[in-house]
Amino acid sequence: MTRSLVIGGSGYVGRELVRQLAAREGDEVHLLGRSQPAGDLPATWIEADITQRESLRAALAGREYDVIYHLASLPGDTGDPLQMVTVNLVGLTHALEIARDMPGLQRFVLSSSISAYEWYPATKFRAPAYQPVDEEHPTRPEDMYSVTKRAQELIALTFWHQDRLPVTVLRLTAVIGPEGSGGGRSWRAFARMLAEGKRVEIPFFSMEEICHYIDLRDAARMHVVAAEHPGAPGQIFNCCGAESTSGMEFAAALQRLRPGIEVVTGFPWSMAQGDVIEFDMRKARDLLDFVPEYGIGDTLAHVLAWVEGGGLERTPDPEEEVSDTGVEAE
C-alpha cells in the first residue's frame, strides 16, 4: 500500500491525479487544502493552508506518507508579487521542510511548468534557442509567474542536494482535459463552445502555429511514474504530449468530431502566439520509460464525451471554487 498526500489536489491536474491514485487497489490518498474541495473526490481531506507554517505542521503532525505531490501554485500571474512569492515559494518551502523531516518519505514530486524556461501566454513570445526544447535549454523567465516556477525548481532541488530529499520536478506544458478548474479554467470556455456546437475558438493565433499540449490523463499519470521510478530523484523532466500540434491539425481533429462546426483562431491565449514551439520528451522516455498515451484527437474526444455526458452541468464552475491557498490551484 502506498500512502500519498496531494497538496493542491482540488486543482485541474490535482483532481485527476487524486482519481488515478484512488483507483489503485489498497492505496491511501489524502488531499490537503484550505477549503474542502467541490465535487466528490475519493480522498481524505486535511484542512490546512500551505502559507501558514505552524498550522501546516500541526495539521500533518504524526502523519507519514510514502509520496508527497505538490501541485499547489497560483495558476498565473495575479499582479501581486508578494502573493506570488508567498504562495508559490514560501508555501512550497513549508511543504519541503515537512517532507524532509518525514523519515519514511520516498518521493516528493513538484509540478512545475514550461514557463520555467520563460514561455507564458501573457508575455511576448521569444523563440527558443533551439528545438525541440529539452531540459538543458536555458531558462529565461521574465514575468512573476515564470520566475516563481523556476525558483520553485531551484528551491526543491536544493533540498535534494543538501538533504537528499528525493525530489523530482515535472515541467508541464498546456494541459487539455475536461472540468477546467485552476490552471485549466480556460478549457471550460472551450468546452462550452463545443457544447453549443456552432463555432469554436482554438488556442492558436494562426492555423500555422505549432504548440505542444498534453492530455490531462497523461499529465497525472506522469506524476505517478515520477513518484515510483528509481531514476527520477534529482531530475527535471518535460511533461508534454508525444507530438506537437499545429492549428490546422487541431482544427481538423475537432471537425472530425463535430462535422460542420466552424473553427477559428482567437482563443484568449496561445502558447507560441502564432510562432512555433516544440518540446523533447526523450529524457522521460529513456529514464522513466514514460510515453504519453493520448494524441490530440483522443484528448478532444475525451473533452467532447465529458460535455455530452453532462459534465458542464455536474462540475462546479471554477469561478465559484476556492483552492488550497484561497485562490485557484493548478
Model-derived regions, located:
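Active-site Tyr-X1-5-Lys
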Residues: 140-168
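Conserved C-terminal active-site "lid" loop/helix of NAD(P)H-dependent oxidoreductases
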Residues: 216, 248, 269-291, 312-314
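NAD(P)H-binding glycine-rich loop region in Rossmannoid oxidoreductase-like domains
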Residues: 47-87
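N-terminal Rossmann NAD(P)H-binding glycine-rich loop of SDR-like oxidoreductase domains
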Residues: 4-24
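Conserved Rossmann-fold NAD(P)-dependent oxidoreductase catalytic core, especially the SDR/UDP-sugar
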Residues: 94-143
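Glycine/proline-rich active-site loop of Rossmann-fold NAD(P)-dependent oxidoreductases
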Residues: 150, 163-165, 176-189, 216-217, ...
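Mid/C-terminal beta-alpha module of Rossmann-like enzyme folds, strongest
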Residues: 222-270, 314-315, 320, 326-330
